[in-house]
Every structure is written in C-alpha cells, then in structure tokens.
C-alpha cells in the first residue's frame, strides 16, 4: 500500500511500509 498508509497489505513488510510510506 502506497500513499502514506501505515497499515500495509503485507504484515511482513509492515515495518518497511511504515518507514517509507508514513
């Protein structure tokens, strides 16, 4: 999930998305 979502579709990549897309 891109666009500033802190809750990605993939829990495993949650820490990645939270850093890059928050």
UniProtKB/Swiss-Prot annotation:
GO cellular component: extracellular region
Family: Belongs to the peptidase S1 family. Snake venom subfamily.
Any GO MF annotation of the entry: toxin activity
Tissue: Expressed by the venom gland.
Domain of life: Eukaryota
Domain Peptidase S1: start-end pairs: 1-22
Species of origin: Bothrops jararacussu
Enzyme kind, highest EC tier: hydrolase
UniProt-recorded name of the protein: Thrombin-like enzyme BJ-48
Function summary: Thrombin-like serine protease which cleaves specifically the Aalpha chain of human fibrinogen (FGA) to release fibrinopeptide A. Also cleaves rapidly the Bbeta chain of human fibrinogen (FGB). Is selective for Arg over Lys at position 1 of the tripeptide substrates.
PTM notes: Glycosylated; required for activity. Highly glycosylated with 42% of N-linked carbohydrates composed of Fuc(1):GalN(4):GlcN(5):Gal(1):Man(2) and a high content of sialic acid residues (8-12%).
GO BP terms in the entry: proteolysis
Temperature behavior of the protein's activity: Optimum temperature is 50 degrees Celsius.
């Amino acid at each position: 999930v891109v666009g500033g979502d802190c809750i990605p579709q993939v829990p495993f990549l949650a820490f990645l998305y939270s850093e890059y897309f928050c």
